[in-house]
Structure formats: C-alpha cells, structure tokens
Amino acid sequence: RFYTKFLNDIGVVDFDEPFTKLFNQGMINGSDGQKMSKSKGNVVSPDDLVRDYGCDALRMYELFVGPPELDADWDDRGIEGVSRFLNKFYKLVMDNKDKNVEADRELLRVRANLISDIEQRFNSFSLNTVIAGFMEYNNKLNELSKKNGVDKETLKAFVILLAPFAPHIGEELWEALGESGSVF
C-alpha cells in the first residue's frame, strides 16, 4: 500500500489505493486462547486433521469458526460438526441422485432462497454465515427429502455453491450427479 501511495505522489499511477477492497483476516489461536506456537505446545497438526476429517472439513471449519476478520480459538468439536454436515450432505445427494423428482413449489422456493442467501453472505465476506447457511439449507432439504425426495437441479445448485468451500467433495458429488467436467 505504501508503494502505491508513493507512486501516486510522484505521478506514476493515477490511483492512491492498490485495491478496491481490503480484507484482513484474523488468526486461529490454540484452544487455550493463546497464539499457536510449537514452544507452547498448543499447535494442532493439519496432517492429523486431514487424515481424520478430510481437507474439505478442515477448510470449512477454518472459515466457519467465526467472523473471518476476528481471531478465534480452535475447538475440536467444531471440525467434528463440519464433518458431520459434509457427511449428511453427501448422503442426501447419494440418496436422491437417481430419484426422478420434480421440483415442487417448496423445493423451488428453498433453492431460490439458498442461492440468494449464500450469494449475499458471500459478497459481504461473511464466510462463517455462508457455511451456517449451508447447514440450515441442508437440514431443510433433508426434511423435504423424507417427503418426496429432492430434485437433481436443487442438488446441483447446492453442489455448485458448496464447491468453492469443499472442492473435493464438490467434484465427487458433481460426478455422482452425472455431470461431466469440473464443477468449476
């Protein structure tokens, strides 16, 4: 930022900020509330977490732990919750992917709300609430699935929205839904 200000002052560039939006993220501290440090012994091994929960669950938990601009304390129960959500969504897709379900008014409303809510939350950098929204809509779709099932277009829309946060599961579910190429 300093260089841009300097270059603007000497007339090399005609703008004084290097970007239109600046976002500074917080830090994830150890479960004791202190900065993670090997010397303090409060470091969480990402290798162990990826082995136990998968990299998509780890990525989503880091985004879900709180507002991204604030510091947060690590909590193993949080990654377990995100892992349960991903497993529940995976099961929802697998249980409904071959059903020939027409989207009724309620499913269409849920799909439209999902897309609108997630887009709004994402554009305001409220990534933790994006993931909370995924969980809310997953619960709604599971309820609707018990009645008649969930149509493929709604499942595909959810997978597309989820993929930037859980790309490995997103790709696998995209393929399971019969789509070719990448979900991206």
Residue ranges of predicted features:
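Helix-rich, typically C-terminal accessory recognition domains appended to large enzymatic cores
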Residues: 2-3, 12-16, 48-184
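Short alpha-helical segments and helix-capping/turn motifs at coil-helix boundaries
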Residues: 4-9, 44
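Cation-handling catalytic/transport regions enriched in His/Asp/Glu
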Residues: 25
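C-terminal, charged and often intrinsically disordered regions of DNA end-processing helicases
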Residues: 39-47, 51
